[in-house]
Amino acid sequence: INNIPVFIYGLLEEDERRNYMRIYRKQLRDSQNPFEMPEVEFIKTFRLNQDLTRILIEWLEPHAGIRRRTTKLPFYLEVLATLNFLGTGSYQHSVGSCTWVAMSQPAISRSLKKVCRLVTGLLMPEWIKFPTTMEEKTAIKGGFYEKFGFRGAIGCIDGTHVEIITPPITDVDHPPHVYIDRNGVHSINVMLICDSNCKILACDARFPGSVHDSAIFRVSDIRNNLRMCFENGDDTSWLIGDSGYGQEPWLFTPIPVVAPGSPQERYNQLLRSTRNPIERTNGILKGRFRCLIKHRVLHFHPVQAAYIIYAASTLHNIALWANLALDEDEIAVENDEGNGDNAVG
């Protein structure tokens, strides 16, 4: 009984501390304008430049909902907090301590969920598109032929793993054991397809880490589309994949055993060089948005983790559109997680 007053005092003290931190963070936010940061520091902190970030906010804000409370965070801060998290990958601690954002970790988490879903729902359908018309296919083929001398390629395909925390054991729709990949960690196996300029043409983050690259492609709408196009007479368009995929009329992969100096060896060499963009795409994507990099575990349920992956992939294409280059030393190098030769991580 004697401990009750102490306990009550502790609760009051904790409430007072929370109120103080809430007021402090608001005062800190009000006193600083992130858009007054030097451009180099802004890009380092938020991974996009200031002009592109403003454009992103303009695209999303009309769909962000009404601010019902004066204490509610301005939408631009929610976007900045999301960009900072995507770029750092250190969960919410570094974001919460960023004085330019000055938000609590729960607020960061809510903002991340909100903004990633907005980007996925509104922008991803416009910015990540697989070629379907002859004009689109011809343009992509021209890029591959000009760079690598390989005819007919309309994309490079591979899988890349993004680590996540163990899903709840009670989640019957996402049983933890199916997310354990070949490296023994829980992950999502993401199917990526890109063009010769590292633009992402397709991104599928629905499958757990135990699912093979080829199995994901086999049930994809893209494979079904390629098969139907082939059956309707388009026999000059194909994807480029590694040995983790099966050879198909619309998917070229390496020939397993070839004689030195043979045409088959030359084909394998040309195929390998033509696959370079998918490795580079993965490196740029994870280098810019380091929450996806190997060993930076996403502490989210698989569904929310997928939204983060989709948002980062969409922003990757938007950054390419804006010619926002990434320093070579920032490009991630991962080569030990895939299912085939020269696998992307």
Locations of regions flagged by a protein language model:
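Short acidic-aromatic active-site loops that bind/stabilize oxyanions
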Residues: 42-46, 71, 271, 275
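A structural signal for short hydrophobic/aromatic patches embedded in well-ordered alpha helices
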Residues: 55-56, 81, 140
